Amino acid sequence: MEHYFTKSPKSELKIKKIKAVLRSKEIEFYTASGLFSINKADKGSKLLINKCIIKDNWKVLDLGCGYGIIGLSILIANPSLKLTFSDINERAVQLTNKNLKLHNLNAEVIQSDCFKNIKDKFNTILLNPPQTAGKELCFRLIEDSKHHLEKEGILQLVARHNKGGKELSKKMKEVFNNIKETAKSAGYRLYISQNP
């Protein structure tokens, strides 16, 4: 089976719609084959969406956005945000744009291998890391996030604590010299580090 962390998925494109209740609102999304969690909102993304820290007018990066479920849910709840979506997967970029259009929202969507095509700095980076793509990649995303956060900006990462999340939180502590666990649900935890 093809991995979703790939630039150009080879699987046949099959688009469908799903619904999820996120931030107390039912939201519809287009999903497609070749992306992560296409049949329903995954538990990690739900935790990140419902418990992340967001302030009005913030610049937000949804890193590894997939079909855009995290960033779209946040943007629908707070249209004042300046949101950027990014994913290596061209199909993810296509579906995120389709979902923005579905909800009459505007945001920047960038196809990028990690931070390669991202120049801006953000108040927060939201990340449900592609753990099945490997620990080294996830560590690189954490390390590179530091250089793309404003002063006092925050990295908000969700992961299954007993399936690699513990190691990712240690890496965040190493990179940022601080870590907070702010929420947990169904084995997932939300870890937050602040750029000094």
Question: Over which residues does each language-model region extend?
Answer:
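N-terminal auxiliary segments of SAM/dcSAM-dependent transferases
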Residues: 1-23, 33-34, 38
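Class I S-adenosylmethionine-dependent transferase superfamily signal
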Residues: 74, 144-145, 172
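A short glycine-rich, Lys/Arg-flanked "PGG" loop and its adjoining helix->strand segment in the class I
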Residues: 139-151
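Short beta->alpha hinge that forms the Motif I/post-I loop of the SAM-binding pocket
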Residues: 87-90, 137, 160
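Conserved class I S-adenosyl-L-methionine
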Residues: 160-177
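Conserved beta-strand signature within the Rossmann-like core of class I S-adenosyl-L-methionine
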Residues: 152-160
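Conserved SAM/SAH cofactor-binding pocket of Class I
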Residues: 43-127
